[in-house]
Amino acid sequence: MKKLWGGRFQKTPEKWVDEFGASIHFDKQLVKEDLTGSLAHASMLNTCGILDDEEAATIKDGLNKLMKKAEADELEFSVDYEDIHLNLEKMLIDEIGPLGGKLHTARSRNDQVATDMHLYLNNQVEHIIELISSFQTVLVEKAEQHVETIFPGYTHLQRAQPISFAHHMLAYFWMLERDKARFQDSLKRINVSPLGCGALAGTTFPIDREYTAELLGFDHIYENSLDGVSDRDFILEFLSNSSLVMMHLSRLCEEIILWCSQEFKFIELDDTYATGSSMMPQKKNPDMAELIRGKTGRVYGNLMGLLTIMKGLPLTYNKDLQEDKEGMFDTVKTIAGSLQIFTGMIQTMTVNEDVMKKATKEDFSNATEVADYLAKKGMPFREAHEIVGKLVYTCIQEGIYLSDLPFETFTEASDLFEEDIYTVLDPYVAVEKRTSAGGTGFKQIQLALEKAKACLA
C-alpha cells in the first residue's frame, strides 16, 4: 500500500516492518485530542486565508463526523497508516475527498503529536488533581472520627511514642497536598502550544500560532520551534510527579498490610477490598494494597524509561520519541486507579480502637514522657535519658511495664519523681500534652483539621 509520505520511495516496507514501526495500537488513545487539534488548525488556516470558507467548513464538518464516530467507538484503525494522525487523515479524505489532504498544510506530525500529548495531559492531570482531593477528603473524614484514638507511633518499625490515629492519617493528607500542588504547578508547563512549530523550523505559511493556542485553551506558545517538537520534559514532569504520589500511596499500603495482619490487628479491610485464597479457607488478603505497592514500580519504570530515551537524543525529532506514549498512558491509568481504590479502601476500613489503645499500654512508648518529666524538673535531658533507659531495662528483666513499677523504684532512680508520674505514663495524657505546632496533641489536630478542610474548600 502506498504511503502518504511515499513519494521519494521506490519500495514499500515489508509488512513486519510496518507492524514494528506502527504506533496506532496505542496512540489511538489520542484520537479526540488529534481531532480537536485538527479542528483548531482548520479554523486558523481559514482565518489566515490559507483555506477559504467553503474548504474550511467542509473539512471541519468531516472532522466533526469523525469525532462523533470516535465518541461512539466506531472508528476502525489500520496498521497500514502507522499512527493516529495518518489514520485520521485517510478517514477524512475518504469522508470529504482530496480536500482532506489540505488540512496538513503548515503542519507536521511532529508538532501535531506534541500538541495531542499536551492536550491529553492537561485533561488527565486535572482529573488526577480531583482524585487526589477526593482521597484527601476521605483522609480528613477518617481523621475526624479518630482524633482521640490512641495509636502507637513508630520509628524503625519499633513502637516509639503514642500518637493520635488522626495525626497519622493527616500526615498522608499533607503529603498528598504537596503532590497536588506539584501537579497544579505543572499545568503551567503543560498548557503550552507546540502547534505551528512544523517539523522543526516553523513554516513559510502566514499562520497564527497564538490563535490556535487560544482555540485549544493553551496559555501560551512554545517560543522556539526546535524546543516545541523535540522535548518531552512535560511528560517527564508528569511521570516524576506521579512517582511521588505512588511512593506516598505505597508507604501507606505497606502500613495497611501490616495493620490488618494478625500480628497487629489494628484495622480490618472491608471485604470489597480484600481477596481470599484458593487453598486456605481462612485467608483474607490485602490484595489491593499489595497491588498498588507493586504498581508503584511500574510508574518508576515508566519515568526511568523515558529519561533513558531522552538522554541521548539530538535535536529535534527522532523516532525514539514514539516510545514516549505507552509509559504515559500506563501511568495515567495506574495512578488514577490507585487513587480511586485507596479512597474506597480507607473510607470503608474498620479501625480497631481498643487494639490500638492496648498496644500503647503494653510497650515502652511512654518512656520519653518520663525523661521529659525529669528534664522539666531541671535534670539535663541526657541524664534523664540514662535513668529512664535503666528503668526500662529493669522492666524488661521483670516482664512488666513502666506503669507497673512501684513508686519506690522510681524514687530510687531519682528523688525528682513524685506520685504524679503515673499520670504522666498514661498514653492519652502523653498525646494530649504534645501541643507544639504540628504535633499530635488533640488541640493541634483540631487546628490541622481546620487547615486541611480549608485546603479542600
Curated annotation (Swiss-Prot):
Subcellular localization is given as: Cytoplasm
Coiled-coil stretches are none
| Short name of one Pfam family | ASL_C2
Q: What class of enzyme is it?
A: lyase
Q: Does the keyword Nucleus apply?
A: no
Q: In which pathway does it act?
A: Amino-acid biosynthesis; L-arginine biosynthesis; L-arginine from L-ornithine and carbamoyl phosphate: step 3/3
- Gene Ontology MF: a single term: argininosuccinate lyase activity
Tell me the protein's name.
Answer: Argininosuccinate lyase
Originating species: Bacillus pumilus (strain SAFR-032)
* Gene designation per UniProt: argH
